Regions:
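Pyridoxal 5′-phosphate
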Residues: 1-407
Length: 407
């Protein structure tokens, strides 16, 4: 396996232009964020924030400042409503398991949309082992949740509802305020969680305005370091911690806080929000140029997800008929263009994305999908380069498929 990877890397030698569009699965951390983090490894605030000495007090001060800033960016009422976790995945695990276990006397029914991310979907299914039931609410062909079905599904036994603000694969923006209102009208005791990771830094997110009880955000989704995320839990909502260990500054997540990563997450948030409108307009313009160019140059392509204002400004998920997605990612990589297959969450099992299946895509359409996400650091030249390579790569793969009779 390692030798195969080395051969693939050798094949990339000589690439002169690189465009990183796989911002769903990881991101390039800007130098400003790296520079903000580095001193906290060995220059200052490197202590345990719970200990009574200078490095500990420095760390405590920095972490409290980050709590305050992230709570402000999310629209939380008080900083104690924020818990830092090692990632979006851990935050979603804490939200679903912690809320379900803490409130099981009120009901054992969990409701999610059928296109929730794997780290929500699998946790909801796992909770069935503990005598909880899971009901999935369908979406339409754009990936928008069926609010009437949601209304029919929620009842007095519903303890928890989880619906993303923005779907990570499709970019479709859900009507969260309306969904929360429906849930609370049917059952005021039900807890509403949203994974806001793909909304945070891209569209306005204010947890008080949305009236959600819990919300997850992720650092790397906004060009911060991997290994850090956060969970908002509204004051008064009962959530149990799901791990045991040394208690630091947080009651819901044990262990010593990772000061450098928290600082990096905070800096990335500051950069995302300081010129928010300009940043999102830039992402949208680049994305639109990319999508328009693809549809101009190629036939037999489909845009997956919603359009216009109902879509996140960075997301482009396109199905290329008669061109297998994994083959296309490799072909593009050899030209310095890095994207992901739309079936990335389950590609090791060679299964199509559950999200694309849910919106009605055929097997061949789902396996021919490519997910690309723009950032504020990309340029028009990057998009021009992609549009000069992508159509040729698609046609080359289609030619191979056609010559072998494979469909």
């Amino acid at each position: 396996m390692v030798e195969n990877v080395r051969e693939l890397l050798k094949a990339h030698e000589g690439i002169t232009h690189e465009v990183y569009l796989d911002n769903e699965n990881s991101t390039i951390v800007p130098q400003e964020v790296v520079d903000a983090m580095l001193p906290y490894y060995n220059k200052k605030a490197y202590g345990n924030p719970t200990l009574t000495h200078k490095p500990g007090w420095e760390a405590f001060e920095v972490i409290m400042g980050s709590f305050q800033k992230i709570s402000k960016f999310m629209g939380a009422k008080i900083l104690e409503e924020i818990t830092f976790t090692p990632s979006e995945t851990e935050a979603n695990n804490l939200a679903l398991m912690g809320a379900a276990f803490a409130n099981k006397a009120k009901g054992r029914k969990i409701v999610i949309s059928e296109i929730e991310p794997i780290n929500v979907l699998h946790v909801a299914e796992m909770l069935q082992k503990y005598n909880f039931s899971t009901t999935k609410v369908p979406v339409n062909t754009e990936g928008t949740i069926d609010l009437e079905k949601l209304k029919e599904t929620v009842d007095k036994e519903t303890v928890l509802v989880s619906v993303q603000i923005v779907n990570n694969e499709l970019g479709t923006i859900q009507p969260i305020k309306e969904a929360v209102a429906i849930v609370k009208d049917k059952n005021p005791e039900a807890i509403f969680h949203t994974d806001a990771s793909d909304a945070y830094g891209r569209i306005p997110v204010n947890v008080q305005d949305l009236k959600v009880d819990m919300a997850t955000v992720s650092s790397f989704k906004i060009l911060g370091p991997r290994g850090i995320g956060a969970l908002y839990v509204r004051e008064g909502v009962n959530v149990e911690k799901i791990l045991e260990g040394q208690i630091g500054t947080q009651k819901l997540w044990p262990g010593i806080e990772n000061t450098p990563l928290i600082v990096g997450f905070t800096k990335a948030s500051e950069l995302a929000f300081e010129n928010f409108e300009a940043n999102t307009n830039r992402m949208r313009s680049l994305r639109d140029n990319l999508v328009d160019g693809v549809f101009k140059e190629l036939t037999d392509v489909k845009l997956n997800g919603a359009k216009g204002d109902k879509r996140s400004p960075d997301n482009a998920n396109i199905s290329f008929l008669r061109a297998e997605g994994e083959a296309l990612t490799i072909e593009l990589s050899l030209s310095g263009i890095y994207v992901s297959s739309g079936s990335a969450c389950s590609r090791r099992l060679l299964q199509p994305s559950h999200v694309l299946v849910a919106i009605g895509r055929k097997f061949s359409e789902a396996h021919g999908s490519i997910l690309m996400k723009t950032t504020r650091y990309m340029t028009e030249e990057d998009i021009t380069y992609v549009l000069g390579v992508l159509p040729k790569a698609v046609n080359r793969i289609r030619g191979i498929v056609g010559s072998t009779g494979v469909d």
